[in-house]
Amino acid sequence: ARLSDPGYAAPAGEEYRPDLRHVGKDREKVDAQMLVQGERAFVEDRLPQDVCWLKVLGSPIAHGWIKAIDTSEAEAMPGVVAVVSHLNTPRTLYTSAGQGFPEPSPYDQALFPRKLRYVGDRVAAVLAESPGIAEMAIKKIKVEYQPLEPVLSIAQAKTEGAPVIHSGAVSYASGEVPEGISVKGDGRDDGIIYQFSLHADPHRNLAASASGGIGDIAKGLAEADLVLERSYRANRVQCTPLEPHVVLARIDAGRLVLHASTQVPWHVRRIVARVVGISENKIRVIKERVGGGFGAKQDLVVEDLAGYLAWTTRKPV
């Protein structure tokens, strides 16, 4: 079919509500011309000539400790701006899921963990003048790992004596510590901060819990003609938009500016401010056009590390 064919386009629906200007009226998509003409709209359209490129070294193991890191060869390479790991970055705890405030999600991560919890977890990162240099420098980083038994299912995580994923100390920003919860932890591991109780017990791999009932449940079950007990499991869903997570972080007149493909610019500003250690009014988040999100871009994946490196190196990242 061709655009010139009379039957190509569906006829517009009848307009309604003559008393209103927009509701019930045929209106042109506000950004249609910009997109079809190829105008700058996305994060990658904003990259300056002197932009630096960030490459992350991911964990090859699902669970374990980082015993030693040697970044000297990577640091000595021409074109490398910075090499970072848990050895030279703040231990500030935060959450990458910022919905709501105070956030119900626990503050359970730092820029780089000392204890690795999944394949791909951040071990180190290189900031370099080109993607190729960053890629080569990553391969120069030497890491000694101490593998631990991984937890591969919810059923395994619930068993007595299962490997503990978050073994650090637990603290609460407000409220009392729930009865029976262990708050002391392994000093080698970063801790967890809860803004308020979620009836969690991290040292038993319990992220949060909720229970309740109406009336005398035991009596009701005893008197019931039929008791049906079932367990239901929903698999994890991960959205895959055409545009992956991407950000450009730069300094402008003393402020940190983030051009982000995000659904939550205000959360990005608040969380990055905590990570970098500056006030929110020192950060400007420009929400560029998002090439698909579907909820996946309500979390921070790259904004925290890129923002930190842009602020500390004063380079566009």
State each model region's role.
Residues A1-D190, V227, T312:
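Flexible, low-hydrophobicity surface segments
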Residues G191, N205, G212-G215, G254-L256, ...:
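Helix-loop-helix module between adjacent transmembrane segments
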Residues H86, K282-E288, K315-V317:
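Beta-strand segments within the central parallel beta-sheet cores of soluble alpha/beta enzyme folds
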Residues R270, E288-R314:
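Thiamine diphosphate
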Residues E73-E75, R269-V285:
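Phosphate/pyrophosphate-binding loops at sites that engage ATP/ADP/AMP, CoA/4′-phosphopantetheine
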Residues F101-P102, Q263-P265, A273-G277, D299-L309:
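A glycine- and small-aliphatic-rich helix-loop capping segment at beta-alpha/alpha-beta transitions
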Residues A210-V276:
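Conserved beta-alpha junction segments in alpha/beta enzyme cores
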